[in-house]
Amino acid sequence: MENQRRDSRQEAQRLVRARAAFVCMALCAAMVLPARAAAAEEHEIVVERNVAAKMRDGVTLRADVYRPKAEGKYPVLLVRTPYDKRNETNFGLKAAAHGYVVIAQDVRGRFESEGEWYVFKNESQDGYDTVEWAAALPYANGKVGMFGGSYVGATQFLAAIAHPPHLAGICPTVTASNYHDGWTYQGGAFEQWFNESWASGLAENTMRRRAEKKYDPLGGSKVLPLNAYPVLEAPSGEGIAPYFKDWLAHPSFDAYWKELSIEDHYAQIQVPVLSFAAWYDIFLGGSVKNYVRLKTEGGTEAARKGQRLVVSVGGHAGQSSTGKSGAVEFGSKLAMDGDEMTLRWYDWLFKGEANGVEKEKPVKIFVMGKNEWRDEDDWPLARAKNTKYYLHSTGGANGLGSNGALSAVAPAEEKADQYVYDPSDAAPTIGGPLCCGALPTGIGPEDQRPAEARSDVLVYTTPAFAKDTEVTGPVSLDLYVSSSAVDTDFTGMLVDVWPNGFAQNLTSGILRLRYRNSQEKPELANPGETYHITVDLWSTSNVFLAGHKLRLEVSSSNFPRFDRNLNTGEEQARATRIVKATNVIYHDKAHPSALVVPVVP
């Protein structure tokens, strides 16, 4: 495990330096687009490095500027990144040649910019100041747009809620709506693999800045005792990533998180948004929510009517151009030029080009199974019908080969299923939405049969479908549960079972029982008491081809994607004591547990 963690830290450090891991241009490489207008400009380019922008508190942030050499005023595309602005060179050159000023800025406390780095904290204020600074540059025409993914998407939304007057559009990719639920936690469980690997990668630059810090010999000479002379102090781990400890200290949705929640500030967003998401991305839930809620809650008509959503397949680090994601081959249609898509949208929005964008439907999704792109009028699909698949068994749904079943028929009197959840032997993560280090079991769609073979994983499966059956939209799991512990987790996973037995994970979720009623006010459970809970499995789009089966997995862990609930009810960040829990899933007339999926006729 230690070697695995060391490898993951190295991978995380590589990923946070690599533009392809996060920006829109990598993820969106998934679709064939109409060409931009034939009259596309080709400009000679000027590149300026480390251009200073002073924030309102006097801190200087530095940016690289790529712009056309010819005199004139051009729209600005801004990216504010903690991952080193030099990684934006390729797109900067391309967009500048096409008639844009591209500004790539290191955010506060990162790489060439001054100040102290703390995740999310300064992005609204600094984003506002940078947008207005950029709009006032002598070669800017006053229109500023933003682009980029993951945290770089967060810098866009956090700037947008401050509504700087010259911000005219944003293009966020694979980013969240809430930095508590859907980023740091999900359903009350800590997103352990992502946050540990991401924080480790971020810490690399902070440690380097500390190591390179120049000490003042004259000032240092006044320090007592002599052995405390600053130059002798090597950088320590203390203070390298204070935000990580703060995340753990705030497991509930409290004031620490509310200040940063995009969901609580949609009315302050006043610009059109082109959002990119992916079915196997760690931020899928928030990406979709941003689109859905901004349509009705955006602060202006332009914002409400200007929402666009594209959902691809690949995970957080984008997808290969080969059409393969994880263990599944999705075909040659997963080929595209993502830079082209972004520029085409901004050509329409900022330059007024009639390039076809104005005629397109607002939603574009990749439908797995059929492996094709489809345009939609909205999301969720109005024609989709929420369908309940009820859980059935004779009390022995444990593992593959069990008698667990799914049916549209509600249960009568049936024996409950139970299993022992042992945190010291937790059900493992196999593929799925992961970042920012690769697990040996893969990322994205992978074969779930090794997990399904465990006795602490309940398996419920439909008969093989006689005809193609499409599930597209939000998926949820209604369960009636009890536990011998005062706190435990319940997980759910929707799976497509191929005729050869391959079990492809589609989407999944988790709920920490203490957060069954609220993310703000945890309530421990009474052992043995039955509770009705809902586990949000986020969304998917998949056609279960004829001969395939639909499967549900229910368990109490998905480790190390999520932290293990130790079942004690103690503070998770400090707890070490482990208790086994006997967890029960009820499915009878009084407790009709069901998987709810949107079936498209």
Model-derived regions: residue spans:
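N-terminal cap/lid segment of alpha/beta-hydrolase-fold proteins
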Residues: 40-72, 461-467, 480-481, 521
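Alpha/beta-hydrolase fold nucleophile elbow
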Residues: 138-151
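Short glycine-enriched nucleophile-adjacent loop
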Residues: 153-164, 479
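C-terminal, loop-rich substrate-recognition/catalytic regions characterized by aromatic stacking residues
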Residues: 221-231, 324-601
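Active-site-adjacent alpha-helix of alpha/beta-hydrolase-fold enzymes
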Residues: 285-307, 575
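Accessory cap/linker subdomain of secreted extracellular hydrolases
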Residues: 97, 161-268
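Cap/lid segment of the alpha/beta-hydrolase catalytic domain
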Residues: 68-136, 178, 182-186, 190, ...
